[in-house]
Amino acid sequence: MQNTDTTKYIIHSKISADGIIERPDIVGAIFGQTEGLLGSDLDLRDLQKTGRIGRIEVAVGAKGGKTKGNIFIPSSLDRVETSILAASLETIDRVGPCAAKIEITQVEDVRATKRKHIIERAKFILTDMFDENLPESQEIADEVRQSVRIEEMQYYGKNKIPCGPNVVESDAIVVVEGRADVLNLLRYGIKNTICVGGTNVPPEVAELTKKKTVTAFTDGDRGGKLIIKELLQVADIDYIARAPDGKSVEDLVQREIVRSLRQKIPVEQALENYTIKTDAKPVTTETPAKGSRITRLPKRKERPELSVPAVKQLPNKPSRSEEKPGVTREPRTTREPRTTREARTTRETRSPRETRSPRETRSPRETREPKEAKPAMLSPQALRFKPHSDALIGTLGARLLDSKDEIIEETAVRDLVNTLKENDEGIKSVVFDGVVTQRILDIASDKGIENLIGVKKGNIAKSPASVNVLTASDF
């Protein structure tokens, strides 16, 4: 009999015979042809009596004068003995009067099957049988977390602004909108946060941002955008992070918070993304426009003052004509010289025409050409990297160069940080169509990169002496 409690392996084999055979014939052939083959320790009859071999199961069928089927032998032997026993079955070449062939197809580990069943059952028990207790335990855990968060919250400045415990000591801080945002970030271990309490940024926060690396983390709505605009005017911000569209920072879970902070962008790039630069331009352009108008107004006032004496002289002329009434026709003759004035004007118009033609052929165009030829005055470093810089304009791409200024690799600007971290192929220069930020500059210094060429510089607090930075203004 098969002892299911001690079965470790099941030997799977298939049999084919040139004739019609039945189960007793196959079982008899197995016992008969393996008897004495492997010695007394592995004799099938003795192993079955002691329970180390279970009941031999046979499933066969006859079709077209031939028999095919499967044989299953349970075993509680170890792996070596089970393998020897399985190999001995393949030595059987006849079953009854028919030629037969047995082939081992699989040795199944019963314990592995049991382990799979245990895992599946445990999943079911965990998900279905513990559901009733989860809400109550979750409420207890939330209550404990809430009490810990309230104890960890501190207050900064005279206005007692809610903040995390590490705001003063940390080199980098996260600026959020309200007290609930600080609590939510404390819940997930982010302790260097401080809130602004709306669009009216407290002076303490504005002063604190000048001393640290600041990331503004706001809601994914219009209010969050307004807070960013306010911070850009009164505070010093390095990076901007936004919650997903339509969500608030206080409602985010840990995965969403980490993703949003990892996707932060430099403030220079955010100015273009959130169209803050376009809103700020009219403010700068209006002031010079007003100044120019103010300077023009005095000129317009001076001109009518000059015309007033001319108007005053006109009434003096008719006074002379009144003294000589008969000579009133003479002014008409004097009006004829107006034709001469017209002639003079024609002469004057002719002379400018003659002067205009040489003006068109004059050297301003020639003078413009040397203005375009200014690259001759560029520094040797700028001339060295100008071909790469010109080729990358508008592509948002980057080139990694070796000591001979040959291209090692090309990548996108958004992947430049990861590429520099992973690449150790002797990069000496990096030319890219983007902003030179503090992060890229630090990585370049760590990697031994000598030259960084970008569109413009970001908010750089520390510039390593070992890295030479060039921007579009150098070209």
From Swiss-Prot:
Its cofactor is Mg(2+). Mg(2+) 2 binds at D219, D221. Residues 171-257 form the Toprim domain. It catalyses: ssDNA + n NTP = ssDNA/pppN(pN)n-1 hybrid + (n-1) diphosphate. InterPro entries: DnaG_primase, Primase_DnaG_arc, TOPRIM_DnaG/twinkle, TOPRIM_dom. Mg(2+) 1 binds at E177, D219. The keyword Isomerase does not apply. It is an enzyme of class 2 (transferase). PROSITE patterns: TOPRIM. Binds two Mg(2+) per subunit. GO terms for biological process: DNA replication, synthesis of primer. Pfam families: Toprim_4. Residues 282-381 are annotated as: Disordered. Coiled coil: none annotated. Keywords: DNA replication, DNA-directed RNA polymerase, Exosome, Magnesium, Metal-binding, Nucleotidyltransferase, Primosome, Transcription, Transferase. GO terms for molecular function: DNA-directed RNA polymerase activity; metal ion binding; poly(A) binding. Its EC number is 2.7.7.101. GO terms for cellular component: cytoplasm; DNA-directed RNA polymerase complex; exosome (RNase complex); primosome complex. Residues 319-374 have a biased composition (Basic and acidic residues). CDD domains: TOPRIM_primases (cd01029). Forms a ternary complex with MCM helicase and DNA. Component of the archaeal exosome complex. RNA polymerase that catalyzes the synthesis of short RNA molecules used as primers for DNA polymerase during DNA replication. Also part of the exosome, which is a complex involved in RNA degradation. Acts as a poly(A)-binding protein that enhances the interaction between heteromeric, adenine-rich transcripts and the exosome. This is DNA primase DnaG. It comes from Methanococcoides burtonii (strain DSM 6242 / NBRC 107633 / OCM 468 / ACE-M).
